[in-house]
Structure formats: structure tokens, C-alpha cells
Swiss-Prot record:
This is GMP synthase [glutamine-hydrolyzing]. HAMAP family: GMP_synthase. The gene is guaA. GO terms for cellular component: cytosol. PROSITE patterns: GATASE_TYPE_1 (PS51273), GMPS_ATP_PPASE (PS51553). The keyword ATP-binding applies. Signal peptide: none annotated. Coiled coil: none annotated.
């Protein structure tokens, strides 16, 4: 079996918002990499046995901060690539000088490559469009580094050590705005570090299955299946590895999208022949939420009841030794960053449930090395449907946070129908994958309408569709008026409890994507 971790890159994080992008670009080239805080122990860096090290950007100023790259980085003899802050600290630690720029530079810029024979710029033209994001600049490279690229506002846009495989770029090759950024990453990782491209879906599947078999043996495994991307892919890889040793528990809260519970059962229980226990808990959730209007209270009630029901059912499964979870690599990074990183974490992720306290289960996380895009590709490789893997994000509390105020059975059914029409038309008009997220929101207010000669006094549905790269910011989707008119007409005509449809044109910020 191929050792997919044999050649790897170590990324030291100085707090850049783009650090995870660096890792994703390295992996897209076909090489495994991991992110660790910049102040990780020197012994750890030495024992990690990386083929190369990347120093990320960061929000600090090098000359005002004691945050530097560990000296061990430059003593190991492996290639080093410094990006933005990473370049600045590397140059300064080798006798160069960094000062505040007269003018900050954020956005696209043209750099001129002065030395095309340098390996970091192999297979590239002299002029390159790149993405800058910095307030400081290198003013003196010192005796060890030479300038290999420059721009109008950044005379030192890239550097190379005269004798060692150390390189620095002031711009961000990891962003898509840098036209040939992936080529720069590939040049460093493959050509300079000499990494073999072993990190691919076929090898990952083979490696994961072998690891799961070795770890689990003949033990039984429990998985909380939600129908979301992560738990679905965990179910598929575990089923392929250990077959009927896996039992999935699917808690149907009644707050899912229209027919979603049946679809989950169809894919996993019928088509894939996975042992899935479906718990119809709709009434328990409605009872628990009766009279509750506060969004945060609703979230807590839904989360706690989900865990309670899962625990009840899991306790009935005899001889189970493992609890599988859909933890992915970005969760691992965010969890670590809460304690160690300089990055400002906007939202942390918590898998629903965690380990039930009274159950002596070991944790199994087959996806913890993978980013979301890799999880989706893994799912395709395991035979899961494309539409399941590339669906829009759905909140953990489900429709509970898309029904404003109190949740009632009538409200849930009304929203499910309206939301399904919106989604169906997005697919029909090939717009679904043009937006990042789209859904309906139930407003518990009534509005007068007229259908035929009949006066109607029914509820209002708000449609929400946004375009976003990272969901930290978003713009409202400029969907065609004819399309919105069609969706509105269908909802008002087919969902009897709705008399009016509105479209949300609020960005994030100032609004959030979800209404609650």
C-alpha cells in the first residue's frame, strides 16, 4: 500500500486568514500537508520530517512583534517558502530590514519576474497578476537574499537565498486571484522539495480502509447519520471497510427538508445496504419546542434533545466499542486555533453529541485529515450521489432556525413545501450551483392576498439566496426577475397557507445568512 504521508509539507501558521488555502493548494498538487502554530516546539518540527516548510502570512508587523519563525526551520536543510509575513520574518532573521509601507497594498497587482531561471518561477512568463495584502515591506534584503521579482508598489516582491533553498513572496500564491499561484506552489512542493504526488482520492480510500480495519478489528461501530455531507461520507467509508459491524442511528427531528428522511434511508439503507436505525422523533421535538420563540433557546433545545435521543438508542446496541464522527480537518484546525493561533476564529464547529459520558466508547474520525472539498471527492469515489455531496449547507437545528419564533407542525409543513419548490426550480434553471446557499424562511405574520375572486389572509415566505466563498461574508444572489416571479407564483398557488413571497436582498454583513 502507498504511504500517502511519506512526502509531506509542514505549514507554520502566523495567523493569516489564508493559511487553510495554502494547505488546500498544496494538497491539490497531490502532496499531504498539515498546519501547526508558528510557536510549535523545535523538537516537533525536527521529528516531523517534512520535505519542505511553508511560513504563512499574518496580521502582525514583523518589526513590532516577537513572533518569528523558529530557528530550527532554517537549520534542517529543507526548502522553505515564506509568504507575506513569512517572507518578511525570514528576511529579517537573516539580516534584512522590514519597514511599514508608505501605502498599504490590498488587491491585484502586476509583478515583474527578474529571474525566470529560478525554480520557484519555472514555466511562467515575466509579468504575473498576483494578489497583494500587506502594510509592511522588505526594504533591505541583506547579504543572503537576492530580489527575484518586483512591482511598482513592492520593489521586493519575491526573494531567493543565494546559497540555500529559501524563497519568499510578498504576494499570496494560495489565493485564486494570483493567476499562476498554483504553479508557484507546485514548483516549490514538487520541483524544489522533491515531493511525490501521492495524495489522491484512490490512495486516500485505500489508506483509510486499511487504517479503519486495523483500528477497529471485529468491534462494532456506531455513527450518528444526519444525511449531511460529512456523516454520509463517514458511513460510506466505514461500510466499505467493516460492513455490518457498522450501525447508523438516524434521528429524524421532523425539521429536515421535504422528504429528506426518506431520501437518507433510500440511499443508505436500501441502495447501500447499510444498517440504519431510523428514529421518528418529530413529536418529541415539537413538544419540546412548544412556546419557545428565542432562537438561541431553540438551538439549545434541539441540540440537547438530539443528543439525548442518540444516547438512548446507542445504549441499546450491544458490544459497541467505537463512536464514529464526521470531524474534518478544518474542525481540527479551528479547535487548535482557539487555544494557540493568532487567527481570529469567527465560528467554531462542534460535532453534534460528542461522546456520551456514560458510554465507554472510543472515538473514530476517518475524515479528520481532509478538507471539505476532499471529503466531497472522497464521497464521489465511494459512489455517493453528486447531488447529495454538493448540496447547499443546512444548519444543524434544521428548519428550526428558518421558522421565525415558535415552531409549529403547520409552519414546518408549509416551509418544507415552499422550500422544495424554490430548490426544484433552481435545479430546473441550472442556477442551483451558481449560488452558494438558497432556502426559504417562514415568517409567522399574515398578509392579505387575492386568488381568483377569493380574498386570502395567509403567511409570508422569504426567499434567501447568497453567493459566498467562505460564508464569512456573502452577497445576495442576483437571480433573474422572471425566475423569482415563477417561484413566487408556484409557491402562492401550490402552498395554500402562503399568500405572499418576498426576496431577501441583505448581504453579510450587515445581515447573517440565516435569519435566526
Amino acid at each position: 500500500m502507498t504511504d500517502i504521508h511519506n512526502h509531506k509539507i509542514l505549514i507554520l501558521d502566523f495567523g493569516s486568514q489564508y493559511t487553510q488555502l495554502i494547505a488546500r493548494r498544496v494538497r491539490e498538487v497531490g502532496v499531504f500537508c498539515e498546519i501547526f502554530p508558528h510557536d510549535v516546539a523545535a523538537d516537533f518540527i525536527k521529528n516531523y520530517q517534512a520535505k519542505g516548510i511553508i511560513l504563512s502570512g499574518g496580521p502582525e508587523s514583523v518589526y513590532d512583534s516577537d513572533v518569528k519563525a523558529p530557528e530550527i526551520v532554517f537549520e534542517l536543510g529543507v526548502p522553505v517558502l515564506g509568504i507575506c509575513y513569512g517572507m518578511q520574518t525570514m528576511v529579517m532573521q537573516h539580516g534584512g530590514e522590514v519597514k511599514g509601507a508608505d501605502q498599504s497594498e490590498f488587491g491585484k497587482a502586476i509583478i515583474n519576474i527578474l529571474n525566470l531561471t529560478n525554480n520557484i518561477f519555472s514555466n511562467m512568463e515575466h509579468e504575473q497578476l498576483v494578489w497583494m495584502s500587506h502594510s509592511d515591506k522588505v526594504t533591505q534584503t541583506g547579504e543572503h537574499f537576492e530580489i527575484i521579482a518586483s512591482s511598482t508598489n513592492a520593489p521586493v516582491a519575491a526573494v531567493a537565498h543565494k546559497n540555500k533553498p529559501f524563497f519568499g513572496v510578498q504576494f499570496h500564491p494560495e489565493t485564486t486571484h494570483t493567476e499562476n499561484g498554483k504553479q508557484i506552489i507546485e514548483n516549490f512542493v514538487v520541483n524544489i522539495c522533491g515531493c511525490d504526488t501521492l495524495w489522491n482520492i484512490e490512495n486516500i480510500i485505500e489508506n483509510d480502509i486499511k487504517e479503519i480495519k486495523q483500528k477497529v478489528g471485529t468491534d462494532k461501530v456506531i455513527l450518528g447519520l444526519s444525511g449531511g455531507v460529512d456523516s454520509s461520507v463517514v458511513a460510506a467509508i466505514l461500510h466499505q471497510a467493516i460492513g455490518d459491524q457498522l450501525t447508523c442511528i438516524f434521528v429524524d427531528t421532523g425539521l429536515l427538508r421535504l422528504n429528506e428522511g426518506d431520501q437518507v434511508m433510500q440511499v443508505f439503507a436500501e441502495h447501500m445496504d447499510i444498517n440504519v436505525i431510523r428514529i421518528n422523533a418529530k413529536n418529541r421535538f415539537l413538544d419540546a419546542l412548544r412556546g419557545i420563540c428565542d432562537p438561541e433557546q431553540k438551538r439549545k433545545i434541539i441540540g440537547k434533545l438530539f443528543v439525548d435521543i442518540f444516547d438512548e438508542e446507542a445504549a441499546k446496541i450491544e458490544n459497541a466499542k467505537w463512536l464514529a464522527q464526521g470531524t474534518i480537518y478544518s474542525d481540527v484546525i479551528e479547535s487548535a486555533s482557539n487555544n494557540q493561533s493568532k487567527a481570529h476564529v469567527i465560528k467554531s464547529h462542534h460535532n453534534v453529541g460528542g461522546l456520551p459520558k456514560e458510554m465507554k466508547l472510543k472515538l473514530l474520525e476517518p475524515l479528520r485529515e481532509l478538507f471539505k472539498d476532499e471529503v466531497r471527492k472522497l464521497g464521489l469515489g465511494l459512489g455517493l450521489p453528486y447531488n447529495m455531496l454538493y448540496r447547499h449547507p443546512f444548519p444543524g437545528p434544521g428548519l428550526g432556525v428558518r421558522i421565525l419564533g415558535e415552531i409549529k407542525k403547520e409552519y414546518v409543513e408549509t416551509l418544507q413545501k415552499a422550500d422544495a419548490i424554490f430548490t426544484e426550480e433552481l435545479y430546473k434553471h441550472n442556477l442551483y450551483h451558481d449560488v452558494s446557499q438558497a432556502f426559504g424562511v417562514f415568517l409567522p405574520i399574515k398578509s392579505v392576498g387575492v386568488v381568483g375572486d377569493q380574498r386570502r389572509y395567509e403567511y409570508v415566505i422569504a426567499l434567501r439566496a447568497v453567493v459566498s466563498i467562505d460564508f464569512m461574508t456573502a452577497t445576495w444572489a442576483n437571480l433573474p426577475y422572471d425566475f423569482l416571479s415563477l417561484v413566487s407564483n408556484r409557491i402562492v398557488n401550490e402552498v395554500k397557507q402562503v399568500s405572499r413571497v418576498v426576496y431577501d436582498v441583505t448581504g453579510k454583513p450587515p445581515g447573517t445568512i440565516e435569519w435566526e
